[in-house]
């Protein structure tokens, strides 16, 4: 389970502003997932432990945070998962809108059902990790770009602004979303 790493990383960044634990992923989704933990001011981060100072000590830091320094582990994990569940619901709604835009309501409802019942989304749509946030913002960026390309006669900065914001959210979610830049470029040429 690497969930404790994401939770500890997000809370450490939110409380200290120090990105030292965010070596693998940008802090956006990790920080978003721990926002409900602000309702628990008694939570302690092990910043007094040597693992805070060591670059390779972040696994130990996360284990200490979740299993030793704090005692309400179930509540910490539950609250950290809530924002990811909402991102999963948002992904379903974007999938619905995508299908509705291209094929109408007859396709949108089954698309929503298939998306929300898809085993990978059901499995990962509740974990406090960066996967769902990256999926949501990458899919939303692709959808917005596709709509822009379909109606290229109305290219205006106001129509590009939401695309740029959502693309920035995708890049802020997970580093692997940068791999979609060439895909989006190829789609633009089609």
Descriptions of predicted regions:
Residues 1, 126-134:
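Short acidic/glycine- and proline-prone juxtamembrane loop motifs at membrane-interface regions
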Residues 20-83:
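Interfacial juxtamembrane loops and adjacent helix segments
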Residues 82-102, 140-144:
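Transmembrane-helix motifs of polytopic, lipid-linked glycan transferases
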Residues 103-109, 153-160:
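Membrane-helix interface segments
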Residues 111-116, 123, 143, 167, ...:
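Short helix- or helix-capping micro-motifs
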Residues 141-159:
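Membrane-interface transmembrane helices that cradle and orient dolichyl/undecaprenyl
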């Amino acid at each position: 389970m690497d969930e404790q790493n994401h939770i500890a990383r997000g809370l450490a960044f939110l409380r200290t502003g120090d990105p030292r634990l965010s070596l693998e992923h940008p802090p956006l989704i990790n920080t978003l997932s721990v926002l409900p933990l602000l309702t628990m001011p008694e939570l302690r981060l092990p910043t007094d432990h040597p693992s805070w100072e060591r670059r390779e000590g972040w696994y130990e830091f996360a284990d200490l945070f979740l299993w030793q320094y704090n005692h309400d582990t179930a509540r910490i994990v539950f609250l950290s998962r809530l924002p990811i569940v909402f991102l999963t619901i948002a992904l379903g709604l974007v999938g619905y809108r995508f299908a509705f835009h291209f094929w109408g309501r007859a396709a949108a409802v089954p698309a929503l059902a298939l998306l929300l019942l898809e085993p990978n989304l059901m499995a990962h749509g509740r974990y406090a990790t960066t996967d769902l946030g990256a999926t949501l913002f990458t899919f939303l960026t692709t959808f917005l770009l596709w709509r822009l390309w379909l109606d290229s006669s109305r290219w205006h900065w106001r129509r590009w602004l939401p695309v740029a914001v959502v693309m920035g959210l995708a890049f802020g979610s997970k580093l692997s979303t940068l791999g979609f830049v060439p895909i989006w470029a190829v789609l633009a040429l089609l």
